Design a protein with these regions (language model features):
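Extreme N-terminal tail/first-helix region
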Residues: 1-20
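Generic, ordered loop/turn and secondary-structure boundary motif
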Residues: 8, 34, 85, 96, ...
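Short, contiguous alpha-helical
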Residues: 24-80, 116, 120-156
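Acidic/histidine-rich alpha-helical segments that form the ligand environment
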Residues: 74-125
Length: 156
């Protein structure tokens, strides 16, 4: 299995362009998820700051615990500086079943949530991991998240 790519994105539009290129060229997996699963997972996590987060097992409840809030801020800064670490499990409910949606449909849904986020002017829901975030912080985190997961798909 190939190693994941180390990529970065300056915008969500650039990430969508990368996804479109992967869909067009084909890809090799450097991890466990296929294209549709990656797109679906990214769609889910980009929608949560707008629609509210699901209940997750978090080592930190930043709303109730000041120490957890500080730990969440430190973890966020580390991700923004260095990217997402490999091997950290995610909520399995945020990963679509392997063949639950076509690659084209998954990309279309991801594109729609990117457009919705870009135009969004409402309140940002508090993150169960990082606490209160503004839209710019969410965008910065999501750019790292998109790079992390799209990096596991290697263009052919």
């Amino acid at each position: 299995m190939p190693e994941p790519r180390k990529i970065t994105f300056a915008s969500l539009d650039a990430a969508i362009l990368e996804a479109e290129q992967l869909l067009g060229s084909g890809y090799e997996k450097a991890g466990n998820w296929n294209f549709g699963q990656v797109c679906g997972h990214l769609e889910n996590w980009l929608s949560y700051p707008m629609d509210g987060f699901p209940k997750v097992d978090s080592p930190a409840d930043s709303a109730a615990d000041p120490e957890a809030a500080e730990a969440g801020k430190a973890m966020l800064q580390d991700i923004l500086d260095n990217g997402f670490p490999l091997g950290v499990p995610t909520n399995p409910d945020t990963i679509p079943a392997e063949d639950s949606v076509s690659d084209q449909a998954a990309l279309s849904r991801l594109r729609e949530v990117v457009q919705r986020f870009s135009a969004y002017e409402g309140e940002i829901a508090d993150s169960p991991f990082f606490g209160v975030m503004d839209k710019q912080a969410v965008l910065s985190l999501q750019l790292r998240h998109f790079a992390h997961h799209l990096g596991f798909l290697i263009p052919k």
